[in-house]
């Protein structure tokens, strides 16, 4: 909204069409001027296929497609700028992982002595292949034991640990990631 970008959100689950006000993320996006295209869960499975994208182009005209999670070559390149010379003394760089873009940028820009550890918010082994699309380095590892059953799921113990960690370090952590 501030930059004048016209945005269209392709939303999985056409049942959400009448529940925008109940969803803080959709409400905020709508307040910022985003238009929505609600699609069935079945249709959403085809979101990266040419025919699906062409249907969107017919309806909305020319657009730049930001993939789910935001991961693409430009995102990875941008995330390569996260680490700076001030981070050179760290041996480990840890990051939450959603779709792999941020950690890919960190892997590409980490120094030879640094190991990048990623903690996926999603269950499943698909992220290894996604990350390999963007990196050649071997300086990384995914720690896959902390997804708590899937995206956005947490346990009481995890929240307690996050609070303890914040009290010890002053670093806030995101419970979703």
Report the location of each language-model feature.
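PLP-dependent amino-acid enzyme catalytic core
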Residues: 1-177
């Amino acid at each position: 909204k501030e930059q004048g970008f016209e945005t269209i959100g392709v939303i999985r689950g056409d049942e959400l069409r009448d529940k925008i006000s109940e969803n803080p993320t959709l409400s905020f996006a709508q307040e910022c001027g985003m238009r929505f295209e609600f699609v069935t869960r079945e249709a959403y499975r085809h979101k990266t296929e040419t025919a699906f994208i062409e249907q969107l182009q017919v309806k909305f005209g020319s657009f730049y497609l930001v993939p789910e999670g935001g991961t693409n070559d430009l995102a990875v390149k941008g995330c390569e700028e996260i680490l700076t010379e001030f981070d050179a003394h760290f041996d480990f760089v840890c990051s939450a992982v959603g779709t792999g873009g941020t950690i890919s940028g960190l892997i590409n820009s980490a120094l030879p002595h640094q190991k990048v550890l990623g903690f996926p918010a999603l269950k499943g082994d698909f992220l290894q292949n996604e990350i390999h699309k963007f990196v050649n380095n071997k300086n990384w590892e995914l720690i896959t034991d902390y997804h708590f059953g899937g995206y956005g799921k947490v346990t009481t113990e995890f929240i307690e640990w996050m609070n303890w960690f914040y009290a010890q370090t002053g670093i806030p952590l995101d419970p979703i990631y």
